[in-house]
Curated annotation (Swiss-Prot):
It comes from the Bacteria. The keyword Ribosomal protein applies. GO terms for cellular component: ribonucleoprotein complex; ribosome. Keywords: Ribonucleoprotein, Ribosomal protein. It comes from Agrobacterium fabrum (strain C58 / ATCC 33970). One of its GO terms (molecular function) is structural constituent of ribosome. The lineage of its organism: Bacteria, Pseudomonadati, Pseudomonadota, Alphaproteobacteria, Hyphomicrobiales. This is Small ribosomal subunit protein bS21C. Belongs to the bacterial ribosomal protein bS21 family. GO terms for biological process: translation. NCBIfam families: S21p. Disulfide bonds: none annotated. Gene3D superfamilies: Ribosomal protein S8. Signal peptide: none annotated. Residues 52-76 are annotated as: Disordered.
Length: 76
């Protein structure tokens, strides 16, 4: 992965690199590969993640249809 450093602004280039890595899922992949995960544990984790995604989608759809109240935004 490449990031262009403009005007010797390394901080900005580092922020852009981190954002790209985050979007690609590199940090998550590194965390998952730190230690061996048994196949049964991996399957259970993936199933739980899928259920969470489905619940989130259902909750968002219910909010769009007006069946659930939307979360109030916190004003600063």
């Amino acid at each position: 992965m490449q990031v262009l450093v403009r005007d010797n602004n390394v901080d900005q280039a580092l922020r852009i690199l981190k954002k790209k890595l985050q979007r690609e899922g590199v940090f998550r992949e590194m965390r998952l590969r730190e230690a061996f995960e048994k196949p049964s544990i991996k399957k259970a984790r993936e199933k739980a993640e899928a259920i969470g995604r489905q619940r989130k989608l259902a909750r968002k759809q219910m909010q769009r249809e007006g069946l659930l109240p939307t979360k109030p935004r916190k004003d600063k």
